[in-house]
Amino acid sequence: LGKRTQVGVVQCKDAFYGQHSPERMPVSYELLNKWEAWKRLHVKASEMESAALFVVADALNCRCGSCFHVVWNQEREKAGLDQDMSEDTTSAVQVGVEALKRLIQADRAAQ
């Protein structure tokens, strides 16, 4: 499809503002330390939805994957770098659909 992609570990969390405004939280020191740890571990992104999908998939004994559309990068912003912001999720949907097609083809070929 010619899309720019990255593959790697993504952190799934339960609190949006804990990441984006950690200094406002009662456990700010803990949130800031964890964020530094995620960065040192080269985690690609942080999101809030996929953990539930992976848990349900495991409970149902089926496969699960995720494809993310990056809206903005807070580390680039902190460094004063340009943000290539886009809320158009069309590319992420296209990649996800193509990935599913390829998984189905591979499964059928293996039977």
Please describe what each predicted stretch is.
Residues 1-111:
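Glycine-rich phosphate- or other oxyanion-binding loops that anchor nucleotides, phosphorylated ligands
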